[in-house]
Each structure stands twice: as C-alpha cells, then as structure tokens.
C-alpha cells in the first residue's frame, strides 16, 4: 500500500524546485522544461487544494497530506517515463513534509516523512523570497516569508541535500539553474 509514495527507479536526472509559496517555482519549472525539451511535474497540491477550496471553502487539513503525497508521486512516476534525460519537479514530498510541520505544530505523518526522506533527487533549487508575493486562494503566509525560507533551507541542510539557492530576477535564476544542471548532466 505504501508503494504509492515511492519513486519508481529511473536513470534520469531529477531536479526539484523547493521553497516557500510565491517564490517563482512554477515559472522556473516551466522555463527549465522548455529549455531542456522535457516534461515537468506540476504541484499536485495546488489542484487538490484549489478543488477543496472551490467545493468546500476549506484549506488544507492534516488528513489531506497523504492524498496530496500520493497524487504527487503518481504524477512524478508517470512523467518520469516521458522525460528526456531530465525531469523537472515543481515540488516533492520533502516540501509537503515542511508544510506539514510548519502548519501542524511540527507534526508529520510517519508515512509521508518516510518517503519524503527515501525518495531521491539530484539537485534542489531553493527559491529565495526576493520575488514579490502574489495572493491567491491558497497562499496565506505573506508575513512569514523569511521564517519559511529559513525552514526550507534548514531542512535541506539537515538532510544533506544537494542544493543551490536561486535569487534575483527570472533570467538570473534561470541562468544559474541551467549552469548547475548542465554540470550534473556533463558528469
């Protein structure tokens, strides 16, 4: 049953956009996929939680996290088969773990935590908070951006993840990301 949270084996390079809300992750995911002529994995939580908001006017609750994790991994595993040498992921289960802990007083479902730590990626692109925050139905922490960024960065450091921090405008971020991804592709 827990297999639905596990990555399928693959030889392609996997890159994750990682960071607080409204820091340009989706925009950069799309740009990188276009640049590398590959597919990108959207953030399943956005669709899931937008539907919940539209239907019930409710935001994320703890019982939503495992269905979100399952949907995210289903998308990633499906799109891995369609990717060409690199897969760009708008998020991963480690990000879901961070949000779980940030919103639910340090709590994270043990199943989510297990797979957040077991699933592997070649590079994390940590997006900084120097992009203006944009409101939508799901974003709710404009006053806590510095704290959230520190939490995301601390999580990558705690678990020894390979990451770089992206700051600046869209062009600068894209160029830095491409530079680091190319280094991995050329190894």
Positions of PLM-derived features:
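Hydrophobic anchor at the beta1->P-loop junction of P-loop NTPases
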Residues: 17
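Conserved substrate/cofactor phosphate-moiety recognition/catalytic segment
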Residues: 30, 34-71
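Short amphipathic alpha-helices and their capping/turn segments at secondary-structure boundaries
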Residues: 29-35, 65-84, 108-121
